[in-house]
């Protein structure tokens, strides 16, 4: 990208795709973002995820145009590129949105399973700063993912279910490889899918918090809500 005249920056460390999209949306100097990864696919897979200047998944027609411009062979030319700290501001914003005092007072024990993906150390670290007692599994550096498919679905959440039960945690949080999907394990070791989790959150906001208004949901999860 630098060799083609773009001011390209590379993340200083692991970067969950929500942080990448958030940066693209909130930095007026950014026209788009690219992540190399394979989401929930096994370690042998690789792909490219493109976000537009609004931090959203680029539409198909735009991606088709980009793909048509990709040369058949890689260029030998390389331009200079800088680095960017993408996490600090994003994490600060997340911490601002939650009730830190309530979390600190409750000191919940939570199992976090980043599935060897981009969120390792990040979500666990944030929860610890907020006062939670956190147990992180699958957080070490394994380029082969130890054979795990980093998807928050059965049977790949079995280790988190067992960790919740054995540690007496109140919940487990399971994220996929690029950390844009999350699943929940309850205190009894039962898995709650991403779509059902959306419905639980909506129920809490309406029934407990008394909130009302319009809700936008992906089509694949809207029937639950």
Indicate residue ranges for each PLM-predicted region.
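Active-site flanking residues adjacent to catalytic metal/cofactor-binding acidic residues
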Residues: 36, 112-115, 175-177, 217
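Short Gly/Thr/Asp-enriched flexible loops that form oxyanion-binding sites at enzyme active sites
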Residues: 1, 43-53, 122-123, 177-199, ...
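Proline/glycine-rich low-complexity loops and linkers
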Residues: 2, 10-12, 64-92, 96, ...
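Hydrophobic "anchor" residues on beta-strands that sit immediately upstream
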Residues: 109, 172, 214
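Gly/Ser/Thr-enriched, mixed-charge loops and adjacent short helices
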Residues: 46-167
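N-terminal small/polar loop signature for handling phosphorylated ligands or for N-terminal nucleophile
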Residues: 1-45, 125-185
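Short, charged/polar, Gly/Pro-enriched secondary-structure boundary elements
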Residues: 26, 56-59, 190-192
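Short, well-ordered alpha-helical microsegments
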Residues: 17-20, 119-120, 224-225
């Amino acid at each position: 990208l630098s060799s083609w005249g773009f001011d390209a920056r590379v993340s200083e460390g692991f970067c969950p795709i929500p942080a990448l999209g958030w940066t693209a949306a909130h930095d007026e100097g950014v026209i788009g973002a690219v992540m190399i990864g394979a989401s929930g696919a096994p370690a042998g897979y690789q792909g490219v995820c493109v976000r537009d200047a609004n931090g959203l998944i680029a539409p198909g027609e735009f991606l088709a145009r980009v793909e048509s411009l990709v040369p058949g062979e890689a260029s030998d030319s390389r331009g200079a590129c800088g680095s960017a700290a993408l996490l600090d501001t994003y994490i600060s914003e997340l911490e601002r949105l939650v009730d830190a005092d309530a979390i600190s007072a409750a000191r919940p024990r939570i199992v976090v399973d980043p599935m060897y993906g981009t969120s390792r150390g990040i979500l666990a670290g944030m929860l610890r700063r907020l006062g939670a007692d956190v147990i992180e599994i699958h957080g070490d550096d394994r380029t082969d993912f130890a054979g795990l498919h980093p998807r928050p679905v059965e049977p790949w959440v079995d280790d988190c279910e067992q960790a919740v039960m054995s540690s007496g945690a109140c919940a487990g949080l399971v994220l996929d490889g690029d950390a844009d999907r999350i699943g929940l394990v309850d205190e009894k070791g039962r898995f709650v899918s991403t779509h059902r989790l959306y419905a639980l959150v909506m129920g809490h906001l309406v029934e407990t918090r008394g909130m009302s208004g319009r809700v936008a949901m992906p089509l694949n999860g809207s029937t639950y809500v």
